[in-house]
Amino acid sequence: MRAILLLGAVLALAVPTVSAGTPGTSLTITAWSVGGRTMHTYRLTCAPAGVRGPVAGTLRPADACAALREIGARIYLPALSEHLKGCNYIQAPPRASIVGTRNGRRVRTAVQVGGCERPLVPVRLLRRVVRFPAAAVRA
């Protein structure tokens, strides 16, 4: 009976080391403020999904890693914002670049928040009121 309990304890200890061998998520996030005036760099490392506790030597901010899991693959798409024709920024919007690995696969993407996703004035009205150079109208 003791041998079975000892074997069970050894197997229970071996399971986390097996899942700890799978790659986790390691991202370097560089964020710029409005107008690109200030820049901040953050490094985020998450343990693999199968690991319940922090892995030795791994910084694991639980809330940020949980948010990344909730958002899922959507955040790793090539770009999250769309640019509309006839829309110009007065100042550059807040933006971020995300570079690193997700579950062992390379990640490189850029995100812009705000800006021209929803223009306040329809582009047709904007073209009537504002005179664009000829090259900008054709674009």
Predicted feature descriptions by range:
Residues 2-139:
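N- and C-terminal low-complexity/disordered segments
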